[in-house]
Amino acid sequence: MDFFNLLEAAFLGLIEGLTEFIPVSSTGHLLLIGHFLGFESTGKTFEVLIQLGAILAILSVYSAKLARIATDFPRDARTRRFVLGVLVAFLPAAVIGALAHGFIKGVLFETPMLVCIMLIVGGFILLWVDQLNLRPRYHNVMDYPLPICLAIGFIQCLAMIPGVSRSGSTIVGSLLLGADKRSAAEFSFFLAMPTMAGAFAYDLFKSRNILSFNDGALIVVGFIMAFISGVFVVRHLLDYVSRHGFALFGWWRLIVGSAGMAALIIWG
């Protein structure tokens, strides 16, 4: 392990935290970076634990809201309906993700060109949705009806294709189903908690026999960077999309997807 390895670990942790909660596909970015940089020194352990850093980032930022939800849950029907809605939205990904885990990790995650195509397609979709003259019916995540939550949950399953983006699919789905931009992003945050935690736990279980902490310093650096950058994004994203929408992320996807595709064609 040398300074370059530490720098690379910090960079990957930064990318995980910055891209996990915005609609640009953290998995797509990490797969492309891994393909072109060949970062394999920490393997599965590094991949799993930097994701934990992002999970803890959103839990820390939303700790006060989560505590309030827990306090209100026994006596407030609206809060109970909201929690049920998040769980209902989580179920499709939990079931389909468990059933298709081998195919997703073994086939889809080994196809960098697919990542680039999905980044580009998703970029065009974000730009299109951002320009639509939508009239939102839901301005607060607490008011999402259960059928809407279930529909968002099925739409989230599209993000099992690397490059689609979990947050991107849920945000676009929420917007098209009647949510305003701020609540769409916030519901994506709440849905991220069980979805990411479930994916983390499942990956940890499936990889339990190959996990290694030999490169502990790299794991710690990546974890810390994912946590810090994740906290920054979660704190500022809602205000940003309320004022500016999602066009920036659409262009971001188009640029990264096109650059990745060109690099794959030229260098493979």
From Swiss-Prot:
Q: Report membrane topology.
A: Multi-pass membrane protein
EC number, as in UniProt: 3.6.1.27
UniProtKB keywords? Antibiotic resistance, Cell inner membrane, Cell membrane, Cell shape, Cell wall biogenesis/degradation, Hydrolase, Membrane, Peptidoglycan synthesis, Transmembrane, Transmembrane helix
Q: Which InterPro entries match?
A: UppP
Q: Which reaction does it catalyse?
A: di-trans,octa-cis-undecaprenyl diphosphate + H2O = di-trans,octa-cis-undecaprenyl phosphate + phosphate + H(+)
Q: Where in the cell is it found?
A: Cell inner membrane
What is an example of a GO molecular function annotated in this UniProt entry?
Answer: undecaprenyl-diphosphatase activity
**GO BP:** cell wall organization; peptidoglycan biosynthetic process; regulation of cell shape; response to antibiotic
Pfam families xref list: BacA
CC terms in the record's Gene Ontology section: plasma membrane
User: Is Hydrolase included in the keywords of this UniProt record?
Assistant: yes
Q: What class of enzyme is it?
A: hydrolase
Tell me where the transmembrane regions lie.
Answer: 3-23, 46-66, 84-104, 107-127, 144-164, 185-205, 213-233, 246-266
Additional remarks = Bacitracin is thought to be involved in the inhibition of peptidoglycan synthesis by sequestering undecaprenyl diphosphate, thereby reducing the pool of lipid carrier available.
Q: Which family does it belong to?
A: Belongs to the UppP family.
| Function as written in the Swiss-Prot or TrEMBL entry | Catalyzes the dephosphorylation of undecaprenyl diphosphate (UPP). Confers resistance to bacitracin.
Identification of the protein by name: Undecaprenyl-diphosphatase
Gene encoding this chain? Answer: uppP
